[in-house]
């Protein structure tokens, strides 16, 4: 048995807790199914899957201490006391998780239950498989040189505002701990998405909402205006706090159609997570200008596969993106895998956990990069038709090839 990679219940991203609190307040009776996806089809050995099963079971042993609750509440005063009381008593329920594997070493995982109960499984549902894979299946790598590599990344980002977003796909806990420890003294470092590490190092927990909040509103309020409904519900809970909107759940054009003058003024900015960052930035600036809003009063957080080195493509290069938009709109960068799973000769897993059904109705993610689409194919066609007017008869595969 390998060591449990989770350090505590709060060894997770802030957005899971902010969404859990919002779900408890707005939608406490909603049922959900989540599914784990292995985008590159990397096989997992029987031994690795057994280790994953064992550590999923051991998650039930975790609890939040009084000291952690007090520190968390102080760092994030937008949480109400009733949510902190809920979190203090929260325990993971491994019965909500189903793991299967076929003879070809195809590993699958699904999670079912109440939305508020299952929502915290997403992050350990990613880093537990990753930890097992790199301890058992892919062992051809070394920690040697990682500190020096991170220091070089920090130098490259010297003029950028950035945060660590590395929890979900980290190689192990040590890799993320090292990243925050080394990068926290960089002048542009603003915090980490990981609450446990934010409290440990006295930096700001970073995060607001993610795709699952908007995906669920496809069922709770309808597909066409799920973005608007999700943002309005979010503001009902947080009253202007945590004001970074996520535009690409069903495509950014659909989002901006819903991002009216009130919401555009209320939210501090948006997060780019798919499609060309330069095209998205131009679209965002034009949107604000059309509403008489100064784009320089808003921010775009870029977070799509960024790499902190000069060899990165223009679409993945934070420094090039920063320079391109300098003086036109504020920029910040959320960097994940490049901080916590960049090991020469040992590629990072490309894995994700997303909702599959809400109240037994399919939901999908169909963003600006079709390769990131998730969900039932027929449901994808429906969302694509409603949000973009594309015929239901158009094959999904042909669109992914750019046709």
Give the residues covered by each predicted segment.
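Ordered alpha/beta subdomains of enzyme catalytic regions
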Residues: 1-226, 230, 235, 354-403
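Glycine-rich phosphate/ribose-binding loops and adjacent secondary-structure elements
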Residues: 2-3, 201, 206-403
């Amino acid at each position: 048995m390998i060591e449990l990679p989770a350090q505590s219940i709060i060894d997770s991203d802030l957005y899971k807790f902010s969404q859990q609190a919002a779900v408890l307040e707005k939608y406490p009776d909603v049922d959900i199914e989540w599914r784990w996806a292995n985008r590159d089809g990397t096989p997992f050995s029987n031994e690795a899957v057994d280790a994953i099963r064992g550590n999923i079971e051991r998650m039930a042993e975790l609890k939040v201490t009084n000291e952690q609750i007090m520190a968390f509440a102080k760092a994030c005063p937008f949480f109400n006391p009733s949510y902190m009381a809920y979190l203090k008593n929260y325990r993971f329920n491994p019965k909500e998780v189903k793991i299967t594997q076929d003879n070809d070493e195809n590993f699958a995982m699904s999670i079912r239950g109440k939305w508020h109960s299952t929502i915290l499984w997403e992050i350990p549902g990613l880093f537990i498989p990753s930890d097992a894979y790199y301890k058992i299946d892919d062992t051809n790598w070394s920690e040697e040189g990682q500190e020096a590599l991170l220091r070089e990344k920090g130098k490259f980002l010297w003029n950028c505002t950035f945060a660590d977003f590395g929890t979900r796909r980290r190689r192990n806990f040590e890799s993320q701990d090292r990243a925050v420890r080394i990068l926290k003294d960089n002048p542009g470092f603003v915090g980490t998405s990981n609450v446990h590490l934010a409290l440990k190092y006295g930096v700001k927990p970073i995060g607001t909402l993610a795709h699952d909040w908007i995906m669920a509103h496809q069922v709770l309020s309808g597909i066409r205006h799920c973005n608007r409904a999700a943002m309005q519900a979010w503001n009902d809970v947080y009253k202007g706090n945590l004001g970074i909107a996520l535009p690409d759940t069903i495509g950014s054009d659909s989002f901006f159609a819903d991002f009216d003058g009130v919401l555009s003024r209320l939210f501090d900015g948006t997060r780019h997570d798919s499609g060309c960052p330069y095209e998205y930035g131009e679209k965002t600036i034009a949107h604000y200008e059309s509403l008489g809003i100064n784009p320089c009063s808003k921010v775009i957080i870029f977070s799509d596969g960024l790499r902190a080195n000069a060899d990165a493509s223009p679409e993945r290069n934070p420094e090039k993106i920063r320079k391109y938009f300098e003086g036109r709109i504020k920029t910040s960068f959320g960097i994940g895998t490049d901080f916590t799973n960049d090991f020469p000769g040992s590629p990072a897993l490309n894995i994700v956990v997303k909702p599959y059904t809400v109240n037994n109705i399919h939901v999908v993610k169909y963003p600006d990069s079709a390769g990131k689409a998730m969900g039932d194919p027929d449901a994808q066609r429906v969302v694509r038709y409603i949000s973009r007017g594309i015929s239901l008869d158009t094959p999904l595969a042909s669109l992914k090839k750019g046709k």
